[in-house]
Amino acid sequence: MTKNSSTVFTHARIATLEEKAANLGLIEEAALVVKDARIVYAGPENKLPDEYASFEKIDCGNRLITPGLIDCHTHLVHAGNRAHEFELRLQGATYEEVARAGGGIVSSVRNLRAASEDDLVRETLPRLDALIAEGVTTVEVKSGYGLDRDSEIKSLKAARRLGEERDVAIRTTFLGAHALPPEMNGDKAAYIDRVINDMLPAIAEQGLADAVDGFCEGIAFLPDEIARVFDAAKAHDIPVKLHADQLSNLHGAALAASYGALSADHLEYTDADGAAAMASAGTVAVLLPGAYYFIRETQKPPVEAFRAAGTKMALATDNNPGTSPLTSLLLTMNMGATLFRMTVEECIAGVTREAARALGILDQTGTLEIGKDADLAIWDIERPAELVYRIGFNPLWKRVFKGQI
């Protein structure tokens, strides 16, 4: 298929993921038409308009078409790994002991600062390729391991380059308020000053951030410190999102909602009031079962409270070197179901429609509706539940990005 090709996918089953449709919007004996990288028809094959008769045809053999998958929370750009720390923790070392030995996020900061932009792109591409191989068409990538202006800019530029190296959409997020760098000697107020007066203006001027994020936690930054960052982001007209309530309830979910955040992420310790605030604000709950699993957390996010409040839920890998070295959205869906008791429908919507909502791009992608980008994943499966049920098996038949296979 060429960039401006016109193609009909025939003999398919289609899960449109439309907002109000039941059963994932599943249409049997369906066809989907792509023209100029957009979806122009998705519906019963026997109602296919005659105007598409001359288009190139691809027989899907009764396979299932879903929207291309979206990984809406990653720290994909990083240098090195922390496998040695993993071994130390298995031997009983605490996080504090690892940090005192020069590990933890400090080691990731040290590695990233030492790497060139080219190094970062080269090291990140295999992780990105692993996601693409599972039908992922959009990936969010955060900075946050540089923690100074030049290194944060380097990270975001490397992330943007990933979208030039591969057929994938990249959404970049500035996460300067991720941790306190060692050179600040514990002075969080002075560091937040740097984030809002030095880093953010330079990043905004270069148009490098689609969103601004922060880590609201006792080991990172408190709500009043995050609020300063969010006020600055709003002044630059950049939407916000937040790592919230992962290790304790600092009411980060409610803070995110008060700023109309695109999403609040992690949320293991969020309470019912936080869930309700998010629902009212339209803030998506991005759940990250990979991190929950990897750090052996026991407090589950309040899925029932999110359901009761009507809070939208997404799933993501949270790929990062310290707490979730995960590059599989398929496994993430299984974890969402088995660990968090999410339904099949919630899991699949969580890596398509709701993931798009969490990035503020639901008008472009995330469902198979007329006018949206032709980002598709075609699966050799009999029923949608297989995407969530299987572990370590990839049933992807074809991946289509903006109309191109």
UniProtKB/Swiss-Prot annotation:
Pathway: Amino-acid degradation; L-histidine degradation into L-glutamate; N-formimidoyl-L-glutamate from L-histidine: step 3/3. 4-imidazolone-5-propanoate binds at residues 82, 145, 178, 246, 323. Binds 1 zinc or iron ion per subunit. Its EC number is 3.5.2.7. InterPro entries: Amidohydro-rel (IPR006680), HutI (IPR005920), Metal-dep_hydrolase_composite (IPR011059), Metal_Hydrolase (IPR032466). It comes from the Bacteria. Zn(2+) binds at residues 73, 75, 243, 318. Its cofactor is Zn(2+); Fe(3+). One of its GO terms (cellular component) is cytoplasm. SUPFAM superfamilies: Composite domain of metallo-dependent hydrolases, Metallo-dependent hydrolases. HAMAP family: HutI. PANTHER family: IMIDAZOLONEPROPIONASE, IMIDAZOLONEPROPIONASE-RELATED. Belongs to the metallo-dependent hydrolases superfamily. HutI family. This is Imidazolonepropionase. It comes from Brucella abortus (strain 2308). The gene is hutI.
